[in-house]
C-alpha cells in the first residue's frame, strides 16, 4: 500500500512538477518530504506530515531547511520548533 502512495507522488514529480517549475521554498522539496515521511512512518503518519508540510507552502512562510522529523510526536515537534527559533535568534545577534 505504501508503494501506491509513493508511486502517486513520484508520478507527480515526473509529470506535473516539471510543468510548474522549481518553486518549492523548502529543502527537501514537499514531494520528496512526503515520500520520506511515508517511507519512515507509513501511510497515515507520513501523509499527515506531508499534508502538514504542504499547508506551510505559501508566500507568507519563509521556507528553508525542514527535514522529516526523526520521531513523530507532538512533544518532539514542539521541541524542534523551539530549537529552530533559538537558532534564528542566534543568527540575528
From Swiss-Prot:
Pfam families: YidD (PF01809)
PANTHER family named in the record: MEMBRANE PROTEIN INSERTION EFFICIENCY FACTOR-RELATED
Gene Ontology CC annotations of this record: plasma membrane
Cell location: Cell inner membrane
Main location: membrane
Organism: Marinomonas sp. (strain MWYL1)
SMART domains on file: Haemolytic
Protein name as catalogued: Putative membrane protein insertion efficiency factor
Family stated for the protein in its record: Belongs to the UPF0161 family.
Functional summary from the UniProt entry: Could be involved in insertion of integral membrane proteins into the membrane.
Record NCBIfam families: membrane protein insertion efficiency factor YidD
Keywords: Cell inner membrane, Cell membrane, Membrane
ATP-binding in keyword set: no
Lineage of the species this protein comes from: Bacteria, Pseudomonadati, Pseudomonadota, Gammaproteobacteria, Oceanospirillales
Leader peptide range in chain numbering: none
Positions of region (Disordered): 66-93
Annotated InterPro entries: Membr_insert_effic_factor_YidD (IPR002696)
Topological type in the membrane: Peripheral membrane protein
Amino acid composition bias (Basic and acidic residues), ranges on this chain: 73-93
